[in-house]
């Protein structure tokens, strides 16, 4: 039975992070920790599963900061670099296991992951620390442990992306929509 979910915002920054390289505005020049924001990602923990949504270029730093040692799945909202370029850092989560980590993404995002990281998807395990993934193309609602996941189509500029609605049975827990031009 579902008890509760703990959500940690790993990053809430823009696609280039905050502070911005070379910017001397008040926010970027600030020493306030509130103005040190990494790229968008969340960690979701329940008594059954631990998963993240998006693995941007700050993913390794986010994992070290939060002490993340285990993951049961990864969900992707879209294929922009600020959401996927930490993908290779997932190998830490399969290095000591003989299991693959499920990767959930819509077909276009999955194809771009395969194009960007062909060595991960070719099925050849080259060494012990090699990332082993189980690609799961999102085609509708799915479940991770006791969490029901509903993909939410979102317009993000000229790109179609998805957010996620997380539920437990009929109880809606929360939605996560990191990049959106408009919601309908």
Question: Could you describe each region identified by the protein language model?
Answer:
Residues 1-176, 181-184:
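Binuclear metal-dependent hydrolase catalytic cores
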């Amino acid at each position: 039975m579902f008890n509760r979910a703990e959500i940690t915002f790993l990053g809430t920054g823009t696609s280039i992070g905050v502070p911005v390289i070379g910017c001397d505005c008040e926010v970027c020049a600030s020493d306030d920790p509130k103005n040190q924001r990494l790229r968008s990602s969340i960690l979701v923990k329940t008594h059954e599963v631990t998963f993240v949504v998006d693995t941007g270029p700050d993913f390794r730093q986010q994992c070290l900061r939060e002490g993340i040692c285990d993951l049961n799945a990864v969900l992707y909202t879209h294929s922009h670099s600020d959401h996927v370029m930490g993908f290779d850092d997932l190998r830490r989560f399969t290095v000591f296991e003989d299991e693959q980590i499920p990767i959930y993404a819509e077909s276009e995002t999955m194809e771009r992951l395969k194009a960007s990281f062909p060595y991960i998807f070719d099925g050849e395990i080259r060494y012990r620390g090699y990332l082993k993934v189980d690609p799961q193309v999102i085609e509708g609602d799915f479940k991770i442990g006791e969490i029901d996941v509903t993909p939410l189509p979102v317009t993000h500029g000229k790109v179609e992306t998805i957010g996620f609605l997380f539920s437990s049975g009929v109880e809606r827990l929360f939605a996560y929509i990191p990049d959106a031009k408009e919601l309908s």
